[in-house]
């Protein structure tokens, strides 16, 4: 398996609850190298653009409001099989269904406030990384 990259965000709920350090520790302990990292806040327009794929879904408005209500931590991670391995590390969207030892089992409070985002494909990882990090911010 080739080394590749994935994108993650620590969402506003986890940031507000003081879980940044613990989540980053789980990520690095999971064998991921953090190659880009920043604390930022999405505007409503940013959140709408980032989640445009969900625009027709009934939860879209709540998602946009949630993701723009406070700071997030955006990161690009590197590891062999990065996308799939990170999806395993974060766990199921519903924290009640997430496996023990996953980020969402430890830090998510609900399906809507599930602590972290992880790219679902190599293609989306590249798109999502470029959305948050200018070329010279990607190392």
Swiss-Prot record:
Catalytic residue list: 117 (pros-phosphohistidine intermediate)
Query: Where is it mainly found?
Result: cytoplasm
Q: Which UniProt keywords apply?
A: ATP-binding, Cytoplasm, Kinase, Magnesium, Metal-binding, Nucleotide metabolism, Nucleotide-binding, Phosphoprotein, Transferase
Q: Which GO terms describe its cellular component?
A: cytoplasm
NCBIfam families this protein is in? PRK00668.1 (NF001908), PRK14545.1 (NF011116)
> What does the subunit section of this Swiss-Prot or TrEMBL entry state?
Homotetramer.
* Entry's family note: Belongs to the NDK family.
Q: What does this protein do?
A: Major role in the synthesis of nucleoside triphosphates other than ATP. The ATP gamma phosphate is transferred to the NDP beta phosphate via a ping-pong mechanism, using a phosphorylated active-site intermediate.
Q: Supply the name of the protein.
A: Nucleoside diphosphate kinase
